Amino acid sequence: YIGTAGWNYEDWIGTFYSAKQSARYNWLSYYSKFFNFVEVNSSFYTFLTPKVIIEWLNILIDNYEFKFSIKLHQSFTHQKSFSKEDVKKVYSILKPLIEENRLSGVLLQLPYSFNFNAQNFDYLRLVCELFLDYNIFVEFRHNSWINEKILNYFNDNKINLAAIDMPLIGDSLPLMLNKNQEIQY
């Protein structure tokens, strides 16, 4: 599978999307002609509803191979303030994707300030354990997380390290793949 982080970008008009669009022009439908995967970014900023997910699935009803990954809401990854109700909201949007075999996984994108220590490792395990029934992809921004303890935990629990390509600044992470995981993200 190959795709991008999101598909709804105004600056893609005229380069990827047609500069002249009819009222029926649908960006997701067009995007799906070139890619078979997308990382949903909007779920980081707002809790999506199952209705939105079902609308996307209806747009792609004939494109059976297309998959979505859902980025966890910032209350899980950046604010550390999620509630039981927030967990239920995430499960509710995953459900239609699972029913249609369209879920690639759940992405935890962690901030640069989230460095490795015992407290943060415990928190990471807590969040991961909520979603162990799904493919989990963890995107670290701080290189302190690349250690044997983490890689063993990931391998033991089939959690996937997301490879990111970003400028090396301070203690940021270099581009790397975990050769022990089945799925590369």
Regions found by a protein language model. Give the residues of each.
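Residues lining hydrophobic/aromatic ligand-binding pockets adjacent to catalytic sites
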Residues: 1-185
